[in-house]
Amino acid sequence: MQQVKLGFIGYGEIGSTLGAELRGAGLAEVASFDNGAFDGPYAALIQGRAGAAGVALLRSPAELAERCDILVGVTPGSASVSSAEAIAPHLTARHLFIDIASATPKVKQAVAAALAGSGALVADGSIVGTPKDGLALPILASGPAAEAVRDALVPWGMKIDPVGPELGTASAIKILRSVLIKGIEALLDEMLLGARRYGLDDAVLASASKTLARPFPELAAGLLTTGVIHAKRRAEEAGMAAEALADVGIEPMMTRATEARLQWVEALALKEHFGGRVPDSWQDALAAIEARMPPAGGGGQ
């Protein structure tokens, strides 16, 4: 395997996990710059993690750029652009740069704009796993540097999957996926808090598990195609669920939002459009919704 000089901008949970495991895999040169590494409440933690892994902590973006050829941004997404602006004056055509923070495509495009005059080849990355995956943490990558970053780091055990040449594609996949994944987390909280108040948490979880046991594409298709026909009934049931939660002192934030969304679908009169027949595909269902939905800010529920 070819040695590379790798630098992390940020050394929190993701950066420290990858840094330690890459060093363990035999990568000789791993360094990091983190604003909190030498001053702040987490300085001791950052220094301890880096010291244990043999990762060099540097004191400036300039030092990191001088020492490393591949730079990985692992700051919070809110700091992606400012971090790119700080290191941009120190990058050259020898550098590859990938930002793997969770952020919108617009933010990742702003990162690329901040680095545009540097000569560095830039990629947008998004993490679709968790730190417990370790070095095999799944990362989607897009943009001009995506394949080069993959070729340099996959031999060391990283899991990087290029998904296209356009900056922002990887982050769009991740952030839109989060609509569902983060929603599931919030819905589980609400469902099981209510079930706990009724003394039925195990039974409700088991019942939901059976419903969700089908392959996910099949489940999604079934819900979307039947949803355009049965939105009214499902909205009413969501309203009942919200009342049941409120009756035991659980605020039904997610359930009321679900009720409102289903009422919104019902108002599009899709049952009439399809003549009461379930559409052939989820794509047909979504196309019908999109064709009838009011413009953003134009009213509707």
Locations of the language-model features?
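Helical "substrate-binding/catalytic lid" subdomain
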Residues: 173-278
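Rossmann-fold NAD(P) dinucleotide-binding segment
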Residues: 61-122
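Rossmann-fold dinucleotide-binding core
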Residues: 103-182
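NAD(P)+-binding Rossmann beta1-loop-alpha1 motif at the extreme N-terminus of oxidoreductases
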Residues: 1-66
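NAD(P)-dependent dehydrogenase/reductase Rossmann-like domain
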Residues: 265-301
